[in-house]
A protein has these predicted regions:
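HKD-type phospholipase D/PLD-like phosphodiesterase module
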Residues: 3-31, 41-140
Length: 140
C-alpha cells in the first residue's frame, strides 16, 4: 500500500475485529526493521498468543520489537513477559508498573494517585511506515 502511494499518507478503516487482527499479524510478518506495539490490555488467550507468536517470529527474523503494556492488565503474566523480554530483539516495558507485583490492590490503597494513571494506547506500527491504531485491545 505504501509503495503504491509514495510520499503520501492515508487512512483505511478496519471495522471488523477479525480484519484488524489479521492486519496486525500481516504487519508483523511484513516488518523488516521495527515493530512498535502499545496496548492497554493484552489477553493471554488464543488471539493474544497468536499475535505474540507473530511478534516472536518477526524478532527471530531480526526485526527489533518494542512492546509497551499497561501494567494494570498484566496480573499473572510476569513469567510470560519475562520470557518474551529475554529475546535479544524484543524489549518489553510496563507502563506505570505496580510496586507490589502480587498484591496490586495494596498499591491502589497506598498510592492511588500514581497507579490510577493508565495508558490506554492501542497502536501497532511496522517500520515506522504503517500503523494500526484504535479502540481494540488484544484478545478474543
Amino acid at each position: 500500500m505504501v509503495e503504491a502511494h509514495p510520499g503520501q499518507s492515508g487512512v483505511f478503516a478496519l471495522q471488523e475485529g477479525l480484519d484488524a487482527f489479521a492486519a496486525r499479524v500481516l504487519l508483523a510478518g511484513a516488518a523488516e526493521h521495527t515493530l512498535d506495539v502499545q496496548y492497554y490490555i493484552w489477553h493471554h488467550d488464543m488471539s493474544g498468543t497468536l499475535l505474540l507468536e507473530a511478534l516472536h517470529r518477526a524478532a527471530d527474523r531480526g526485526v527489533r520489537v518494542r512492546l509497551l503494556l499497561d501494567d494494570n492488565n498484566t496480573a499473572g503474566l510476569d513469567p510470560w513477559i519475562a520470557a518474551l523480554d529475554a529475546h535479544p530483539n524484543i524489549e518489553v516495558r510496563l507502563f506505570n508498573p505496580f510496586k507490589h507485583r502480587r498484591w496490586r490492590v495494596l498499591d491502589y490503597l497506598v498510592d492511588f494517585a500514581r497507579v490510577n494513571r493508565r495508558m490506554h494506547n492501542k497502536s501497532f506500527t511496522a517500520d515506522s511506515q504503517l500503523t494500526i491504531i484504535g479502540g481494540r485491545n488484544v484478545g478474543d
